[in-house]
Design a protein with these regions (language model features):
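Residue-level detector of flexible, active-site-proximal loop/helix-junction positions
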Residues: 52-54, 84, 120, 142
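Conserved catalytic cores of phosphodiester-cleaving nucleases, focusing on short active-site segments
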Residues: 30, 65-88, 92, 97
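Domain-level recognition of nuclease-like catalytic cores that cleave nucleotide substrates
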Residues: 111-156
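Amphipathic, low-proline, heptad-repeat alpha-helices and/or compositionally biased low-complexity charged/polar-rich
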Residues: 1-37
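A short coil-to-beta-strand element that immediately follows conserved catalytic motifs
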Residues: 39-48, 107-111
Length: 156
């Protein structure tokens, strides 16, 4: 019985490390993605944070964001998953508007969301796109936009 507990703990630690590794691989690409989508120059980049822990002024709750990038008129919130499933899309779409409660000083920015994973099934790309999300997966520049040409992300 003790060895099962130990094995479960090791699996949990491995899953955590895989998630962190995926975040580490995705994070450097996110500012470029926003600059590309928002036609925003390097000089206009206001804020980039990886694993940013912020307190909600209303609820006092602390939340960690995988990547937050502010450039021009936009605030992009990225969530990275080691394995992306449909429920991740659903939960992320619901949580995006809450970003404003954690970053009230960017109230005038248009908030857009990006979900990333190292491998994203085509059906999940379309599902994310249908929900107004940027979908990021591995490509020539490690992470590239997988949405249809001309896709405009929903502004939350």
């Amino acid at each position: 019985r003790q060895s099962k507990k130990e094995m479960d703990k090791k699996w949990s630690e491995l899953a955590q490390k895989m998630g962190t590794m995926a975040e580490d691989l995705v994070a450097p690409s996110v500012p470029r993605v926003l600059r590309q989508l928002a036609n925003c120059s390097e000089e206009q980049l206001e804020y980039v944070a990886v694993r940013a822990k912020k307190r909600n002024a209303k609820t006092n709750q602390i939340k960690e964001f995988d990547v937050i990038v502010v450039c021009g008129d936009y605030l992009l919130v990225n969530e990275t998953k080691s394995t992306l499933v449909p429920s991740d899309v659903d939960q992320f779409v619901v949580s995006i508007p809450e970003v404003r409660d954690y970053y009230p000083h960017y109230a005038g920015k248009k908030v857009i969301g990006a979900l990333a994973s190292l491998y994203v099934d085509e059906s999940l790309v379309r599902y994310g796109e249908k929900n107004g999300l940027i979908v990021l997966g591995t490509g020539e520049e490690l992470m590239e936009i997988l949405n249809s040409p001309g896709f405009k992300p929903q502004e939350f």
